[in-house]
């Protein structure tokens, strides 16, 4: 027998042994029922995935009715172990749960064009550290630039026309949030660069759609397939364009620093780019990919909440005048200081109520298990499992709040008077009853900035414009576990005379 034939025989034998071991090995998750498994006559999981995409909420309720600890769902990505919410406190900060691997795997972070989902290349710990140690303590310093940019964007997007005219709420919200975020993270020139704003808005949408197309192919073929899909080529082009823009920003900043040094003057830039370098402490991170990663996790989520609040206020116009009165009082007294953001309490309550009734996800604690976990009641979660947690409130709003299925803009401002729940009342507060910003150690570190950004945007919008719904009532869109504010419904707006000047209000 030749050496080549020997290699083929040996390789085939090893492959056969591996296949037998895999086929006959007991499934460590077999004790947990699969709620949307294949039905008789279904050879593949295609229909199971469709049922998940269209009926996820009812499947979660069915799972809860069949077990009191855990069950499995076939999702569009994988078979997922869904855990009862009673384990939330036990697992929320568990050292054997990884929160970066699931999105990286779901969105193919190892493929070119999907690098913003690659946690090694983006190093999200650098961004989280920058937000926690630099940006959040400096919230008071970003108020005026955010206000000035909001004034500029709204004049462009909504115009100064005193006549009623229609706008698409989602598109307007995306433009506003993208520009405001870029204003703080990259400066006044980049935030008005149409190419960069287009990347911030469009890359995420394109990545989500392309990921769905890739899931139709066997995973072992993706390294080849992605080179030929036009949408993958578009993603690679956007990443390359983003690198070019950020490279120019870094070069200009270096020139500014050298000039300031030669002139013995300090640079007047709000230096989030320098903050990132400081927090990296010499470690690797890619500035362009990090900024794109920020767009993925922040731009669409904040714009979605802003859109939902606008819709909710149009459906509850009785809130508009009290909100305007609060804004006038607070900004007159505090300007755009940190105290102002805190004292916009009714606006805070309205934001939190909108997030409560229409979160981005109806599950929480989406994690990858890095080592076997045995829970206090003996429930075993094997290493290598992907898990998620039931969010009781998303399935039944009345489970945690009185009249929880009804919108009440005053709900959380009234809860501030209830001692045992007062710590849960702010928009940035996280609890087991309200996981819009996550829960535990991995709660969104940027929520304080997001709250500031959204409040300033709404202050301008409410004082400068009248709002009203048309004949079409907005409907949230569902896709699997996801909920998105209506991307199609338009509202009517017209310019009104604001009671006070807002753009450059100082404390």
From Swiss-Prot:
Record's subcellular location: Membrane
Enzyme class, broadest EC rank: oxidoreductase
Gene Ontology process terms (BP): mycotoxin biosynthetic process
Keyword annotations: Glycoprotein, Heme, Iron, Membrane, Metal-binding, Monooxygenase, Oxidoreductase, Transmembrane, Transmembrane helix
Record EC number: 1.-.-.-
Entry membrane topology: Single-pass membrane protein
Family membership noted in the UniProt record: Belongs to the cytochrome P450 family.
Function recorded in the entry: Cytochrome P450 monooxygenase; part of the gene cluster that mediates the biosynthesis of the indole diterpenes penitrems. The geranylgeranyl diphosphate (GGPP) synthase ptmG catalyzes the first step in penitrem biosynthesis via conversion of farnesyl pyrophosphate and isopentyl pyrophosphate into geranylgeranyl pyrophosphate (GGPP). Condensation of indole-3-glycerol phosphate with GGPP by the prenyl transferase ptmC then forms 3-geranylgeranylindole (3-GGI).
Protein's UniProt name: Cytochrome P450 monooxygenase ptmU
């Amino acid at each position: 027998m030749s050496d080549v034939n020997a290699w083929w025989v040996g390789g085939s034998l090893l492959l056969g042994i591996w296949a037998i071991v895999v086929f006959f090995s007991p499934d460590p998750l077999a004790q947990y029922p699969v709620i949307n498994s294949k039905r008789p006559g279904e050879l593949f999981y295609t229909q199971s995935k469709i049922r998940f995409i269209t009926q996820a909420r009812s499947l979660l309720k069915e799972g809860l009715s069949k077990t009191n600890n855990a069950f499995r769902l076939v999702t569009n990505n994988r078979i997922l172990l869904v855990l009862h919410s009673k384990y939330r406190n036990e697992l929320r900060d568990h050292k054997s749960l990884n929160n970066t691997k699931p999105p990286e795997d779901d969105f193919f972070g190892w493929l070119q064009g999907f690098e913003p989902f690659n946690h090694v290349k983006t190093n999200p710990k650098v961004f989280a550290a920058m937000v926690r140690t630099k940006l959040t303590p400096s919230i008071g310093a970003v108020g005026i630039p955010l206000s000035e940019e909001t004034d500029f964007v709204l004049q462009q997007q909504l115009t100064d026309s005193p006549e009623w005219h229609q706008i698409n709420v989602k598109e307007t919200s995306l433009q506003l949030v993208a520009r405001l975020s870029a204003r703080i993270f990259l400066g006044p020139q980049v935030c008005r660069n149409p190419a960069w704003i287009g990347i911030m808005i469009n890359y995420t949408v394109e990545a989500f759609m392309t990921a769905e197309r890739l899931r139709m192919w066997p995973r072992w073929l993706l390294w080849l397939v992605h080179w030929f899909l036009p949408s993958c080529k578009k993603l690679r082009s956007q990443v390359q364009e983003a690198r070019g823009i950020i490279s120019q920003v870094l070069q200009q900043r270096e020139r500014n620093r050298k000039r300031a040094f030669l002139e013995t003057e300090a640079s007047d830039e709000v230096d989030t780019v320098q903050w990132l370098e400081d927090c990296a402490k010499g470690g690797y991170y890619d500035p362009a990919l990090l900024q794109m990663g920020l767009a993925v996790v922040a731009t669409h989520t904040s714009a979605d909440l802003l859109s939902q609040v606008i819709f909710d206020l149009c459906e509850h116009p009785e809130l508009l005048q009290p909100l305007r009165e609060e804004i006038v009082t607070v900004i007159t007294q505090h300007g755009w200081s940190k105290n102002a953001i805190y004292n916009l309490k009714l606006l805070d309550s309205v934001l939190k109520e909108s997030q409560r009734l229409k979160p981005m996800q109806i599950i929480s604690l989406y994690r990858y298990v890095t080592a076997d976990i045995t829970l206090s009641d003996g429930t075993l979660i094997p290493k290598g499992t992907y898990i998620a947690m039931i969010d009781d409130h998303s399935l039944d709003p009345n489970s945690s709040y009185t009249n929880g299925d009804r919108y009440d803009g005053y709900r959380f401002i009234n809860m501030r008077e209830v001692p045992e729940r007062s710590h849960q009342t702010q928009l940035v507060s996280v609890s087991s009853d309200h996981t819009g910003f996550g829960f535990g150690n991995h709660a969104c570190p940027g929520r304080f900035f997001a709250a500031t950004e959204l409040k300033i945007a709404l202050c301008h919008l409410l004082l400068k414009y009248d709002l009203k719904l048309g004949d079409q009532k907005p409907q949230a869109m569902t896709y699997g576990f996801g909920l998105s504010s209506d991307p199609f419904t338009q509202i009517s707006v017209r310019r009104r005379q604001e009671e006070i000047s807002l753009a450059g209000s100082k404390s």
